[in-house]
Amino acid sequence: MSTRAHDHRQRGRAGCAGALIGAVFGGAAIAAEPLAMTYDSPNNSLQANKPANGAAPPATAAPADANAEFSPQAAASRFPSERATFALSRETWHSDPEILWPGFLSGMRGFEHFYEPVGNPLYFESPFVNTSLRLLYLGHDFPNDSQLGGGNVNVYAAQIRVALTDRLAFIATKDGWSDLNASALPGAEGWNDFAIGAKYAIIADEASDFVLTGGMRWELSNGDQDILQGDSQELSPFLSFAKGYDRFHILGNVTGRIPTDQDRGNNILSWDLHFDYEIAPETLPGFAPMVEFHGLHYLSDAEHLPLSVGGYDYTNLGSFDVSGSSVIAMGLGFRWKLTPHASVGTTWAFPLTDPDNDIMGNRVTVDFMLSW
């Protein structure tokens, strides 16, 4: 065999080997600037040809482990998210230590640039997994011409969420005290029903800024009936999502409300949409105006109360004649993130459908959230 033919074969083998290495490791730098190889007969070895400018061949780093990028340990090192802004300080209250196991208490990291929803807090469950205490006030007015004859209810409550892992959380979303003043009912005060559950993040994709979470909530019938609580237990499976587009964020939720006693509660389907935009991160860091939409559809009648209005999200009245009716409301407000661990939010909501057909007149919601 001639020396020239031998060199050609060796170059061909080297080229195939280089192509195979590039295919296996996906080296972008190798694909961008192929490295030619020649065979050095005296030394019996392959030699890399230097680029024409005399520079050394470009080095290529080993590819990162895709799973490690989204692990609790990796996410914790980026807490808070580089894209997140805060009004007072981005300093954290702790070093995000690992307690018991990865993800316990710290939950899902890397999504702190999103803004938590405010309106419809009893059923609009956030898709994010974290540990938090949320203090709530709801001032709800009843329509004057509805069957409740006007009036209002003021609700004071707290929600607790505990991250068990970076994907799984325990949630306690309904409790507290209500002061009910409806014209058609005697004034009363008392304890609300208690609701607990769990949620699990099915998808948490930082690269796509997308989270999808499913969960289940169980509402007990322990509340005081004088304030329209304590009538029927309820199971409510839900699915929530979040999608970010730079400073613009969309969150949504779909919830089914299934009474365990079909005679005392209506089957209900509710949904929520939240849109926010961080308008001026340099001059108003951590501040985002928001628009929210809340929908509720009564799917069945019950045999508890002879009414043609339901209980919206406050209660489940088990009304005789509500199947097929719907309520859609719109909320305007904002959330302001003060630090990585504290934020305040408020919305004013009003009905887009005929308010006299249900109990939604208008509502002010205010919250203060502390998170781990």
Per-range role (PLM):
Residues A17-G27:
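Bacterial N-terminal signal peptides
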Residues M1-R11:
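N-terminal secretory signal peptides that target proteins for export/translocation
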Residues R11-A17:
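Cleavable N-terminal targeting peptides that direct proteins into the secretory/outer-membrane pathway or into
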